[in-house]
Every structure is written in C-alpha cells, then in structure tokens.
Amino acid sequence: IVAHALEYAADRLVITGDLTNLALEPEFELVCRKLREAGLPVTVVPGNHDTYTRGSARERRFEVFLGEFMAGERSEGDYPFIHRQDGVALIGVSTAIPSLPLVAVGRVGEPQLARLGAALERTAAEGLARVIMIHHPVLPGVAKPRHDLLDLGAFGAVIARYGAELILHGHEHRRIEGTLPGPQRPVPVHGVGSGTYLSQKPDRHGAFSLYTVGPAAITRVYHWWNGSRFVA
C-alpha cells in the first residue's frame, strides 16, 4: 500500500484502527517499526482489536507504543486530537473499548463527544477542511448488533450540530459510502476497506482510498487488490 501510495505522491497515510489482532506487545512493536519505515507521515486511531483485552486498555498499549503517530492538539485526555496540515484538520476519535469474546462494540463516550464538538467548532472557525478519523461505522444499519457503535445516535447529534467535511471509518472491511445530516449540508461518510484483508467477495478485497482535498471538495479514488497489485 505504501509503495503504491507513494507513486501518487501521497502526503500522509491515515489508518482507522485495528493495527493489531490481539493487542499484544510484540504486535505493537512490529506495527511501530513498520510505520516508522513507511516513508511518509502516518496518523492512526485505535480499533477494537487494539484494546482487545482489559489489560491492553488498562496499560494503554496503543497510546504507549503508537503515540508518536497521534501527534496533535488536545484539550484533555488522549482523544480527540487534531493534526493540522495544509488546510486540513485530521481529528482523531477513539471508539476502542475492551469487550467480551465475539463482541466488537465501540463507544465514544460523553466527555469525548463534548471535546469533539468543541474541536469541530474551533477548526471550522479556522477555515480548515475537517476530516474525522474513527474506527466504528457511524451510519445507522451498517454494523451488525454486537459489532456496532453504542452511542451512534449521540455521535450523529454532534455532527448534525457542528458538521464536518468528511468522516472516515473502518471496522467493516469493505467499501462504504453514505452521509450524515449536517447543519448546512450532508456530511460524507466513507468506510475504508482493510488494506490486508483477503476475501473471495469482490467488495471485501484489500483496498485503500486516496483522497485529494481541494478548495471546493474532497475527492476519492478507490484502489483495490486484484490478486497481484493494487489498481484504481
């Protein structure tokens, strides 16, 4: 993915969670090393697999090992964080919570939602294109029960009040496109396929999206694995 993205002169690699499987320390060590070798700046947020056990959440392994890839402004706590670059505000939100086996739910939480609203308001006043990074799907009906965002409605209420230019999520391992209501116009929501996922289903092949942020719009080109290479 990185080699292909660099061919298009990508400015930054953005990953919306699940960088590990079981949130084990050796996994995080490997991920950290690979991201440092990427050859371009990286921004990440955690997924449910990155807090797979209560111990990993308690020890804050994701933040300890990958904190350098979440550099940005914070009002308090780890999330949300704001990374500003070339007229864009990347706003990293965490939905990662430990859960029971075979359960993959997420939650933003009221304190983080309040800080997210303030971050969206502040970056809008700066005239930045606001791109939210979040792991769990934020569109109703996309995630099945026991795999969904528990406070999806509350998240949607924040977006309805403050808006955003784009919301990126992961979790579902497939391409998803939709919108959430915003204060002035619908807010695009894009699910990003897993870059390493192998499946017989065409819509679940390994994939990534390349975004261009222009003065009037954000455009997306979808790149997917055809069995031997990534193609647009």
Residue ranges: model-predicted function:
Residues E29-R115, A157-A160, P183-R185, S209-L210:
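Extended active-site neighborhood of metal-dependent phosphoesterases/phosphodiesterases
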Residues A10, T123-G141:
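Short acidic, glycine-rich surface-loop motifs adjacent to enzyme active sites
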Residues K144-P215:
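Conserved beta-sheet core of the metallophosphoesterase superfamily
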Residues R12-D18, V42-N48, S94, V131-I134, ...:
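Active-site neighborhood of phospho(di)ester-bond hydrolases with catalytic His/Asp-centered motifs
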Residues N21-L24, N48-A57, P98-L102, P137-G141, ...:
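Active-site environment of divalent metal-dependent phosphoester hydrolases
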Residues I1-L30, R36-E37:
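N-terminal active-site segment of His-dependent metallophosphoesterases
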Residues V213-A232:
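A short C-terminal boundary segment appended to hydrolase-like catalytic domains
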Residues P26-F28, A57, A104-V105, Q112, ...:
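Residues at alpha-helix caps and immediate loop-helix transition turns in enzyme cores, especially N-
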